[in-house]
Amino acid sequence: MPSFDIVSEITLHEVRNAVENANRVLTTRYDFRGVEAIIELNEKNESIKLTTESEFQLEQLIEMLISACVKRGIEHSSLDIPTDAEHHGKLYSKEIKLKQGIETEIAKKITKLIKDAKIKVQTQIQGDQVRVTGKSRDDLQATIQLIKTAELGQPFQFNNFRD
């Protein structure tokens, strides 16, 4: 029976490149001259920490990072950006988490979405991915289109397609 997996993965190498590009832009920006501003990637925690002297500059750093990520093929929705900034002394900071894998709650939403569409496929939640199995390729392709058009707050990739 044909099957495929729905996953949500970010290549950390591309994230590292995006952070380096954002840092390069940061050094050339006139409004950040003489300002303590840092964009750093923590690969162990899968997070990006932004630090600067004011909240406005922090928002500018976020825009630079998002722009660099989009240029590297990383979708904006794969970044979990907190709404409020932490304030330590004269510095403001935000820690942006990278969304890796599909959480159980979102996997259940995907399963419910597919069942509500009445496509003749079966879904299985397997850790941080969802396996979809069906009798025909057309049903699987209809499922892929359904997931691509759904707004679930996270980008998805489809891999391990078997016939």
Swiss-Prot record:
Entry-linked InterPro entries: DUF520, UPF0234-like_C, UPF0234_N, YajQ-like_sf
PANTHER family referenced in this protein's UniProt entry, alphabetically: UPF0234 PROTEIN YAJQ
NCBIfam families: PRK05412.1
Gene3D superfamilies reported for this sequence: 3.30.70.860, YajQ-like, domain 2
Pfam family, one: DUF520
Organism from which the protein derives: Haemophilus ducreyi (strain 35000HP / ATCC 700724)
GO molecular function annotations of the record: nucleotide binding
Keywords (A to Z) from UniProt: Nucleotide-binding
Protein family per UniProt: Belongs to the YajQ family.
Protein name: Nucleotide-binding protein HD_0358
